[in-house]
């Protein structure tokens, strides 16, 4: 009901009353009716103003300009599923049966070669120019420490087609033994992982390889401990 309709109803009600109410009792009724009419009109007017200017009503959370309240994760997943990646990628794992050497395999669980990357002569061949993330991890293990320090090295090298030479991209060296095991003491096992990773500009036809100095210490007890891979960025 609008404010104008409520005011009109009150005025019609007042006109319907006798113009003159006899005695004090009639005057009291007129006074009460006038007061009630005033309060009714004032309340209706106040309610109309509050609704009109939005002081009361459904609450809305105000967000910064241009920001939509959405969950971006489902949209991102849908977009990625509609647009399969065509970037070169490779992840190869060590052959646990190749004793005394680090041999990479691509036909194993959790291993892959995709979008042009090849595994040839134990090397990853780059299919196109671009930035690549190159990474590799090896895990060494041994029993006790000899009198001479054990130095473990792990290196990733690149044979570039542009200048036909081999250069080291990443390299690390570690020593798991700080002191030799005393004679007669229990020879405790030790484990030493070496991880290498970095981003490099590569050319089509480049070949990437890994090298270690002491393959006899490689630990193949668990899958996923020794691996090598590249990802085009």
Swiss-Prot record:
It is a single-pass type II membrane protein. The modification Phosphoserine is found at residue 2. The record marks 34-35, 39-40, 49-52, 76-77 as: Cleavage. Residues 1-35 are cytoplasmic. Disulfide bonds join 145-177. SUPFAM superfamilies: TNF-like (SSF49842). A lipid is attached at residues 19-20 (N6-myristoyl lysine). One of its GO terms (biological process) is positive regulation of protein-containing complex disassembly. One of its GO terms (molecular function) is tumor necrosis factor receptor binding. Its main location: membrane. Glycans are attached at residue 80. It comes from the Eukaryota. Keywords: Cell membrane, Cytokine, Disulfide bond, Glycoprotein, Lipoprotein, Membrane, Myristate, Phosphoprotein, Secreted, Signal-anchor, Transmembrane, Transmembrane helix. Coiled coil: none annotated. InterPro entries: TNF, TNF_alpha, TNF_CS, TNF_dom, Tumour_necrosis_fac-like_dom. It is found in: Cell membrane. Residues 88-233 form the THD domain. SMART domains: TNF. Homotrimer. Interacts with SPPL2B. Belongs to the tumor necrosis factor family. Cytokine that binds to TNFRSF1A/TNFR1 and TNFRSF1B/TNFBR. It is mainly secreted by macrophages and can induce cell death of certain tumor cell lines. It is potent pyrogen causing fever by direct action or by stimulation of interleukin-1 secretion and is implicated in the induction of cachexia, Under certain conditions it can stimulate cell proliferation and induce cell differentiation. Induces insulin resistance in adipocytes via inhibition of insulin-induced IRS1 tyrosine phosphorylation and insulin-induced glucose uptake. This is Tumor necrosis factor. It comes from Felis catus. The gene is TNF.
């Amino acid at each position: 009901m609008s404010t104008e309709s409520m005011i009109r109803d009150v005025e019609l009600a007042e006109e319907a009353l006798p113009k003159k109410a006899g005695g004090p009792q009639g005057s009291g009724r007129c006074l009460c009716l006038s007061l009630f009419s005033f309060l009714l009109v004032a309340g209706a007017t106040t309610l109309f103003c509050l609704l009109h200017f939005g002081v009361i009503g459904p609450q809305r959370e105000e967000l910064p300009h241009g920001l939509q309240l959405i969950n971006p994760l489902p949209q991102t997943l849908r977009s990625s599923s509609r647009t399969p990646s065509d970037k070169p990628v490779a992840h190869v794992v060590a052959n646990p049966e190749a004793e005394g050497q680090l041999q990479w395999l691509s036909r194993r669980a959790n291993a892959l070669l995709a979008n042009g990357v090849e595994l040839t002569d134990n090397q990853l061949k780059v299919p196109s120019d671009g930035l690549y993330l190159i990474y590799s991890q090896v895990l060494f293990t041994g029993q006790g420490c000899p009198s001479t320090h054990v130095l473990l090295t792990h290196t990733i090298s690149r044979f570039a087609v542009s200048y036909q030479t081999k250069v080291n991209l990443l390299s690390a060296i570690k020593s798991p033994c700080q002191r030799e095991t005393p004679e007669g003491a229990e020879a405790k096992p030790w484990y030493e992982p070496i991880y290498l990773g970095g981003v490099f500009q590569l050319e089509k036809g480049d070949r990437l390889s890994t090298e270690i100095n002491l393959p006899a210490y490689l630990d193949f007890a668990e899958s996923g401990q020794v691996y090598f891979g590249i990802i085009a960025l």
